[in-house]
Amino acid sequence: MSEKTENSGLSRRRLLQAAGVAGVVGAAAAAGSSGASAGSRSAVRQPFKPRGRLKRRPNFLIVMMDEQRHAPVYESEVLKAWRLANLPTQNRLRRNGFEFTNHHIMSVACQPSRASVYTGQYPSLHGVAQTSGAAKSAIEEDLLWLDPTTVPTMGSWFRAAGYDTYWKGKWHISNADLYQPGTYNPLPSYTDEGKRDYQLENIYLESERLAQYGFEGFVGPEPHGSNPLNSGSSGPGGRGRDEVYAQMGVEQLQKLRNAKNPWLMVASFVNPHDITLWGDLTLASDLSGSQGAFYLAQQLVGSNVPTDLFTSAYQQSANEDLSLKPTAQGSFVNQYPQGFQPLRNGIEYHRFYYQLQKEVDKHIGTVVDALANDRNNYRDTIVIYLSDHGEMLGSHGGMFQKWHSAYDEILKVPFIFHNPTLFNGAQASDILTSHADVLPTMLGLAGLNEAVLAKELTNTHTEVRRLVGRDLSSVLLGEESAATFNSDPVYFMTDDQPFKGANAVSALGIAYQPVEQPNCVESVVTYLPTGPAGSKERWKYNRYWDNSQTWTTPGVQDVQTFVPGPVNKPGNRVAVTTVKAVNPTTGQTAPPADQFELYNLTVDPTEMTNLYTNSASSGTLKIMQVILQEQRTAKRLSPVDQPWADGSMRQFPFTPN
């Protein structure tokens, strides 16, 4: 039997799926049930109990951005006014929404953060700790993706509860691309002009690359790499993937107009991530008009983004002396031109970042409009707006993107819940929240019991653990004051090392070294009663360390060989090999000592003054050290421990390659 049937055009697999569902429905009917499908049997066991204005189990539309930070404190009044006038979709979501204004990510960069959001767990458990690009390709041995049989995703949780689940746009949690035979060249789903190729899109749809992760509807390739058409909007003439992702989102919403089951859809956009493409080399190619160049500066032609974007506090940060900060920060600044490209921290660079936000806001608006035009679905759907991480944009001594530090420019991102019925006007809270809270809160809003679903998911996943975040649904529904959660800390971790890998060669063909250790970071943010008359102040404590789990032999030793100079130049060169060990012997080195930062964010919101060695803050430091240890223990889970034959729980033994 062929994959396509002769008379219907349906794939054999989909016919089998339909037959399977029909069989389940028939069995359920024979048993006297309502005829629910296999995917919805859990939902039958968990009837929905209305809560205030939430009368029925909601649908969810997650709108995810890439690289959009929460507005920093040094924004000018002019920029604030511009955002209000030029980001209508974001402001529309706020008008009938609830915004958490102190929302923090769990990890960086794209892959670790996204895997964390959609599993509710940290990289220490799900294993997605590194980001492809720079020194690493998507197929390298030391770049691990999420295995579908380990930690369940949001799609798996909600499918177990009877939801239909869809993904449109950027994924970046597993290697979901289809490849052309004999190569690692991703199969495009568009023409050479950037137009949609529906036949190629259908191949992606039929392959169901995210089925094991609990989602359907993904169309690749992933939006990264050297092809300008794989950007958000920086292909020829301003074309890119975001426009297409919006179209796909609208098409899916139209199909869901009469959906029988509750549904969850992720509309995942690229921009303002295209800011990472800006630099001396890409701009030179852009302005020369060469074929295959990124369309960057040309997007600013006719742009109304102002030039006076920031107050003087930004310039103080951009000119900061990093010699008083952990050494990884200065090392990252020095290595950036080699790992990516030289970049001038100027006004046009800053304006481009906000122009990209305006561009993607338009595409998000297309999706939100499609939802709003369906009155019933709009009433029954909670829209969640968030970003995977922020962007430094040249602050703190000229740092770009999002690695090797834990400043608010990276950690704080937008987090908005929107629904025209649940939220009467704009509401906001400054309690500390985290990406770890997203999944538990959604389960809470859906009236789903985590323990019941977890028990079912253990049949298909090896690492079904308690979700480490909090259910904030009681705050959103007005049942509980946000102040109830005000003393809860948030935790952040990153082991991402973009300049360490097999492809550590600059655009000029020169080999470069990784960022100086210690460069792994873990942080805790909390409120403490250290202000006048015991008022609460927001504190942040960062630990920089050399995590031995990122070594070539995890927990034992790290062997690195560096051959300096141009990689394509013939002749002899001297290679230098270093061996770092937990217990070093002769000729080996020990890992460097940890380094720390302590900030009073209420007094010092731009994080310029490191109080770690300040004797007046020693009492606060001790408290923050305890909190970091507690948060690490509670949230930085490790792969477990499966029962052995005698019933005991033991760690899987590590076997070196």
Question: Model segments located where?
Answer:
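Substrate-binding rim/cap in mid-to-C-terminal beta-strand-loop elements of soluble/periplasmic
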Residues: 118, 214-232, 368-369, 402-486, ...
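C-terminal, low-complexity/hydrophilic appendages and adjacent surface loops
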Residues: 173, 407-408, 494-612
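Active-site-proximal cap/lid insertion segments
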Residues: 54-58, 67-82, 256-261, 269-432, ...
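Catalytic-site neighborhoods of secreted/periplasmic enzymes
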Residues: 119-241, 276-280, 288-291, 486
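Long, internal low-complexity/basic segments
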Residues: 20-23, 48-58, 65, 70, ...
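N-terminal secretory signal peptides
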Residues: 1-11
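Active-site segment of extracytoplasmic enzymes that catalyze sulfate/phosphate-ester chemistry
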Residues: 62-65, 69-153, 157, 163, ...
